[in-house]
Amino acid sequence: PFDAVLRDGTPAVKHNQWPRLWADLNRSAQRRLGDDARLVFHRSSWRGAPSQVGMFWAGDQLTNFDGRDGMLSALLGMLSGGVSGLTLNHADVGGYLGIARDPLQIIRTPELLKRWAEWSVWTPLLRTHEGNLPDLHAQVFDDDVVADFARFTRMYAALADYRQEVLEQAGQDGVPAM
């Protein structure tokens, strides 16, 4: 943050170094724990990050189909990140941020959750999140979602060997994983 109080007194100079410092801290903790298999994902980056970060995350999208900050924006951000070298990235299935303040209502619907899970089958990581309004948002365990979500997770599992090949190629050639 620009208002940070640092020993050398230069928060603006340090500003763009925070993502790297955070990744360094996480890698150090993993080494100390002897747990290099644990996945840590990041949503900020820097030049050289792909070789040092296990997974990127698109951030807290709105729980809608929108291209400015919803499902479409996550997909576009991941594709753009992929061609920029961030080959291992994902988004919260269904988005995260809902709004329930009249007159604005942005609540995750079963249809959005299913469509988001469907395209996430083709990403390096299929990960759910209950979102910031769990009692209002559709969830993967809801009666009108669970069968479709189970089908998508079976598809994701069935693609494991293919995904491994794609990820290995991404690591060797820098080709986006999606």
Identify the meaning behind each predicted range:
Residues P1-M178:
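Catalytic-domain carbohydrate-binding cleft regions of carbohydrate-active enzymes
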